[in-house]
Amino acid sequence: MGHLYRFVEPVLLLVLKEKGRSYGYDLLRSLGEHAFTDGEIEKAVLYRTLRRLEQNRYIVSNWDTGAPGPARRVYALTKDGEKHLEEWAQVLAKVADSMKRFVRRASSGSFSSHYERSSV
């Protein structure tokens, strides 16, 4: 039911905090497990978000050439990234409260009873 691309950033930060270091394909798979969406996250969204996080110095990357096969870019969280994740946690706590209120109101049937009263 739709993509919440805005939340790719905090999920990436959390995954990197938990894993320490990770590469693109592994992050994409982890996003699917942790994301706030029922759809797949597009690769372009992942890499755009990683670039932005790196430009803002929330993550760093380097090329891993030690493993067999082609070199892979490996990402890691910085201290600034940890602080940014904490900020996201505070924002998401407020969003969660708002969502709970929304769900409660939307599922209470209050709209139909209000509509019926106002149409009389």
Where in the sequence are the language-model features?
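Amphipathic alpha-helical dimerization/coiled-coil segments
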Residues: 83-120
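Intrinsically disordered, low-complexity serine/threonine- and proline-rich regulatory segments
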Residues: 1-7, 71, 88, 95-98
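Short, hydrophobic-biased segments on the C-terminal half of alpha helices
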Residues: 47-51
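Basic, amphipathic "hinge/linker" alpha-helix immediately C-terminal to the N-terminal HTH DNA-binding motif
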Residues: 67, 71-89
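Glycine-centered, phosphate/nucleic-acid-interacting loop/turn motifs that mediate DNA/RNA or nucleotide
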Residues: 57
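Short beta-strand "wing" residues that participate in macromolecule-binding interfaces
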Residues: 61
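N-terminal helix-turn-helix DNA-binding core of bacterial DNA-binding proteins
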Residues: 2-45
